[in-house]
Amino acid sequence: MKAELPEPLKKDGFGEYKLMPESIDDLWHLSHLISPGNTVYAVTLRTVDGPSDKLRSEKLEKRPVRIGVKCEKAEFVPESSRLRVFGVISYGPDMGQHHTLNIEAGYEISVVRQWRQIDLARLERAVSSSVHGVVHIAAIEDGEAELYRVRQYGPERITTLTVGSGKTAELDSRQALFAELLTFLEKVTGSIVIAGPGFVKEDFVKFAKTKAPEIAERMLIADTRRCGYGAVQEAIGNGVLTRVAEDLQLAKEVSFMDEVFLRIGQNGAVAYGKSEVRQAIDYGAAETILVADSFVKDGGIEKMIEGAERLGANVVVLSTEFEPGTRLVGLGGVAALLRYKI
């Protein structure tokens, strides 16, 4: 997702963001960023009547015009890779008429609304999840590792590391190989895919967790049948690039929900369901609020979120398309990790 803020948001968060979705994932994010009452501006084809056009019987040519639609409903349609925004035209030709914007990847829009902290956090996540040129793939097998940077035109090899006794071998043990590869990965700021057959990749991730846990947190394992560049091609072909941001987010969501159920089992500092969470917020005990995305637009929960943010609580929205989100739905769609028991 590309995002541009033409002017600073007002104190209450109201303002306009220019947005360019680049993938089906971005369209999914937009479906949660566009709510009823928001105004969405886009260029679309409309029949524009001139003063004498209505007297003509021939078919008029459609022209590109910029219109604003006050949203009544936003619907994500993954089957056709598009987002539909239904509403009434509030700016441009045919004001007052109903219109549907069909938004696809590469289609620039502007969204005018009051942006809450959870909206800005989702927008930041969508922008940062762009994988072009930032994902690195390490193809590991027994005795060798190759590191690739994913460019828009394809994988670019950075280095090849080998273990052995021959002249081409630079390292004398698996541990030395792991250490050298980790040294290269210290310079990487984005997500890292560890690909290859067998269990060497799992061993490397375990090694990284002990030596550099902050780097290991950004790693994603991809099983492949091939080695080297073939492993990179196979991982990309299996859709690893589109899964990177989701899987890293999923890991965080899994961790949060595991903690919720752990505290429930221990009768610990946790609340779930609207009533309990509202009480926790009122007492100032809520540290982290977890909300299922399908509940965010619920009026009661929306007010709870605003109250929690005013008190400095961290608000995390979980996708109901993933297992942690469905577990949260089973608890009433909202839960809170507390600073202390109430």
Swiss-Prot record:
Pfam families linked: eRF1_1 (PF03463), eRF1_3 (PF03465)
GO biological process per UniProt: nonfunctional rRNA decay; nuclear-transcribed mRNA catabolic process, no-go decay; nuclear-transcribed mRNA catabolic process, non-stop decay; ribosome disassembly; RNA surveillance
Keywords assigned by UniProt, alphabetized: Cytoplasm, Endonuclease, Hydrolase, Metal-binding, Nuclease
Enzyme class, spelled out: hydrolase
Compartments (UniProt record): Cytoplasm
EC assignment: 3.1.-.-
InterPro entries on file: eFR1_2_sf, eRF1_1_Pelota, eRF1_3, Pelota/DOM34_N, Pelota_arc, Ribosomal_eL30-like_sf, Transl-rel_pelota
Gene Ontology MF, one: metal ion binding
Needed co-factor(s): a divalent metal cation
GO-annotated cellular components: cytoplasm
Primary localization class, coarse: cytoplasm
Subunit architecture: Monomer.
HAMAP family listed in its UniProt record: PelO (MF_01853)
Purpose of the protein: May function in recognizing stalled ribosomes, interact with stem-loop structures in stalled mRNA molecules, and effect endonucleolytic cleavage of the mRNA. May play a role in the release non-functional ribosomes and degradation of damaged mRNAs. Has endoribonuclease activity.
Domain notes from UniProt: The N-terminal domain has the RNA-binding Sm fold. It harbors the endoribonuclease activity.
Family: Belongs to the eukaryotic release factor 1 family. Pelota subfamily.
Stated name of the protein: Protein pelota homolog
Gene source species: Methanocorpusculum labreanum (strain ATCC 43576 / DSM 4855 / Z)
Lineage of origin: Archaea, Methanobacteriati, Methanobacteriota, Stenosarchaea group, Methanomicrobia
Gene name of the encoded protein: pelA
